[in-house]
């Protein structure tokens, strides 16, 4: 008798809760669809289209089309930035981009340190930061100048990418710059990176 009573309570609870949970679920779906509708109407109005009435299926279809357009635009921007080679297609390119990002971060840290350390000559700081800027410009020119479809390969003179040529090193007062040995550039191991 107790089991039947518990069963009936559980059954009654499910009987009451299931429709209530379903109503809540549908309310959430409808709320999200209304938000999507507002967003899509705003986007389409900006594109010059006028929408009077949208059904739920229309909202979902327009959203899918809009997301596909956004993804295509993003890929187009990425291919124009990387010279037509997608970063996922060529892992060496993403390594070069990662190297540049690390270089920029390191240059920013040098700049902060120069500003924070008292007694550092302004001329020395200016010269060092302009040298780092010139090297960054060199790094940005190396990869995008490749023709589309040509695989990115390490140049014959790897040391030009790693260290500045000796003529530029001579202009620095510190004299701490020296060309990398040719054996280091020909090793098959991975290049050390500061990040």
From Swiss-Prot:
Residues 13-70 form the bHLH domain. InterPro entries: bHLH_dom (IPR011598), HES_HEY (IPR050370), HLH_DNA-bd_sf (IPR036638), Orange_dom (IPR003650). Gene3D superfamilies: Helix-loop-helix DNA-binding domain. GO terms for biological process: cell differentiation; chaeta development; negative regulation of transcription by RNA polymerase II; nervous system development; Notch signaling pathway; positive regulation of neuroblast proliferation; regulation of neuroblast proliferation; regulation of neurogenesis. Its main location: nucleus. Keywords: Developmental protein, Differentiation, DNA-binding, Neurogenesis, Notch signaling pathway, Nucleus, Transcription, Transcription regulation. It comes from the Eukaryota. The gene is E(spl)mbeta-HLH. This is Enhancer of split mbeta protein. It is found in: Nucleus. One of its GO terms (molecular function) is sequence-specific DNA binding. GO terms for cellular component: nucleus. A motif (WRPW motif) lies at residues 192-195. PANTHER family: BASIC HELIX-LOOP-HELIX TRANSCRIPTION FACTOR, HES-RELATED. Transcription repression requires formation of a complex with a corepressor protein (Groucho). It holds the Pfam family Hairy_orange. Transcriptional repressor of genes that require a bHLH protein for their transcription. May serve as a transcriptional regulator of the Achaete-scute complex (AS-C) genes. Contributes to the neural-epidermal lineage decision during early neurogenesis. Part of the Notch signaling pathway. SMART domains: HLH, ORANGE. Has a particular type of basic domain (presence of a helix-interrupting proline) that binds to the N-box (CACNAG), rather than the canonical E-box (CANNTG). The C-terminal WRPW motif is a transcriptional repression domain necessary for the interaction with Groucho, a transcriptional corepressor recruited to specific target DNA by Hairy-related proteins. Residues 163-195 are annotated as: Disordered. Residues 99-132 form the Orange domain.
């Amino acid at each position: 008798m107790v089991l039947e009573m518990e069963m009936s309570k559980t059954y009654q609870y499910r009987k009451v809760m299931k429709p209530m949970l379903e109503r809540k679920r549908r309310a959430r779906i409808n709320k999200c669809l209304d938000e999507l509708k507002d967003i899509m109407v705003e986007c389409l109005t900006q594109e010059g289209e006028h929408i009077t009435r949208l059904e739920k299926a229309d909202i979902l279809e327009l959203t899918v089309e809009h997301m596909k357009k956004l993804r295509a635009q993003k890929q187009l921007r990425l291919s124009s930035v990387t010279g037509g080679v997608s970063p996922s297609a060529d892992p060496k390119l993403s390594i070069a981009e990662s190297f540049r990002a690390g270089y920029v971060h390191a240059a920013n840290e040098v700049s902060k340190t120069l500003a924070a350390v008292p007694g550092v000559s302004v001329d020395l700081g200016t010269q060092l930061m302009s040298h780092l800027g010139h090297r960054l410009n060199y790094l940005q020119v190396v990869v995008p100048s490749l023709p589309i479809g040509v695989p990115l390969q390490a140049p014959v003179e790897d040391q030009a990418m790693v260290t500045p040529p000796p003529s530029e090193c001579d202009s620095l007062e510190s004299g701490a710059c020296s060309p990398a040995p040719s054996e280091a550039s020909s090793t098959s191991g991975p290049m050390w990176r500061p990040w």
